[in-house]
Structures are given as C-alpha cells and as structure tokens.
Regions:
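Short glycine-rich, Thr/Ser-proximal phosphate-binding strand/loop in the N-terminal lobe
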Residues: 8-49, 124
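Active-site cofactor/substrate anionic-group-binding motifs, chiefly glycine-
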Residues: 83-94, 98-102
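A mobile "lid/hinge" subdomain adjacent to the ATP/sugar-phosphate binding pocket shared
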Residues: 148-172
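Glycine-rich phosphate-binding loop plus the immediately following alpha-helix
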Residues: 38-39, 116-157
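N-terminal cofactor/phosphate-binding cores enriched in small/glycine residues
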Residues: 13-22, 43-53, 59-71, 91, ...
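Short beta-strand-loop/turn "lid" adjacent to the catalytic site in phosphate-handling enzymes
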Residues: 23-25, 32-35, 53-85, 112-120
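Gly/Thr-rich phosphate-binding beta-strand-loop-beta motif of the actin/hexokinase/Hsp70
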Residues: 1-24, 98-115
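Alpha-helix C-terminal capping segments
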Residues: 74, 91-97, 113-116, 140-142
Length: 172
C-alpha cells in the first residue's frame, strides 16, 4: 500500500514549524518551536522525533518552506515550496471562504488578499509589528507570548501605541 503521509516543514527566521498530515488531510502532528539560529540541528531533531513518534519508520513525503528553508531544501534534495504559495494552497483547502490572511513572521509581516487571485503586501524593511516585536513586548511585560495572547483575550480596554515605528511603540 502506498503511504500518503505528508510532512511540511516551515523554517523561518526565528522558528521552525511542522505539520504531519495523513492521506485524508487529517492533522496527525504539529509543532511550533524556536530554532535559535541552529536551523540544521533543530530540523534534524524534529524530523527524528517525527520519524520515531509519528511515522515509526514508514516513508513520508517531505516539503520545506520558509525564509530560512531554501538552503536546507536544496542541500537535502527536498522540494522547496515558496511560503506564500503554500499558505494559499493550505487556506484554500482547509478554510476556503477566507478572503484575507495576515501572517506575522519573525522579521516580516505579510497580508494575502485571496479574492480574484492573490495579492500580497509585505512589510519586509521593518520588524515593527512582527514576531520579533511581539517577543520584545512579552519580555518587557515579563510574560510569554502565549500568556500575552490569553491576557489580550480578556482585555477590557485597548491602548493606543505608536503607529509610525515599532521602536517608538516600546516606550508607549
């Protein structure tokens, strides 16, 4: 029997994300971890864990995406999928009514408009409002990003912060 388990590895500037899907697109496993610039070591560790805990030695299809994934994909002979394309395919398959996707990376922010084709807008020249900025705010507040997210869910008031640059927002 042909195995159609697929592993998607997204390697960004600060984190590595992974999903394992079965032949029916059911999610078998997912993780979101920091790589602390040890991309190769973290990818190896993660793939070994997936093999041991999910695949149990069975073969799977692997694709890599992300801003830091191309070099690894090339060196390993693994297909590289551009991250905006992979996001569009996943959203179309799993949440087809979606019109707009906002993706905050470690060092950039992207907005994908999906109606009538795909339009992409990107803030790649400033880390304000990206994952790195959110991490800095969490550190200043002495909480993790997950804790910050939970606190935001229960917020009773919204505070205005600087809209011109993330650097100035730190003092607000």
């Amino acid at each position: 029997r042909k195995n159609n388990v697929r592993v998607g590895l997204d390697i960004g500037s600060t984190t590595i994300k992974c999903v394992v899907l079965d032949e029916h697109d059911a999610l078998l496993y997912s993780t979101y971890e920091r790589h602390y610039s040890h991309i190769l070591e973290k990818a190896q560790e993660l793939l070994r864990r997936i093999d041991a805990e999910q695949l149990h030695g069975q073969k799977a299809l692997l694709s890599i995406s992300g801003s830091a994934g191309m070099g690894l994909a090339d060196s390993c002979g693994v297909p590289f999928v551009q991250e905006v394309f992979s996001t569009r395919v996943a959203v179309k398959r799993f949440v087809p009514a979606t019109d707009c996707v906002i993706e905050l990376g470690g060092e950039d922010a992207k907005i994908l408009f999906l109606t009538n084709g795909t339009e992409v807008r990107m803030n790649g020249s400033c880390a304000g409002g990206t994952g790195a900025f959110i991490d800095q705010m969490a550190t200043l507040l002495k909480m993790g990003a997950d804790e910050m997210n939970k606190a935001a869910e229960n917020a009773q008031r919204t505070y205005t912060i600087a809209s011109r640059c993330g650097v100035f927002a730190k003092s607000d």
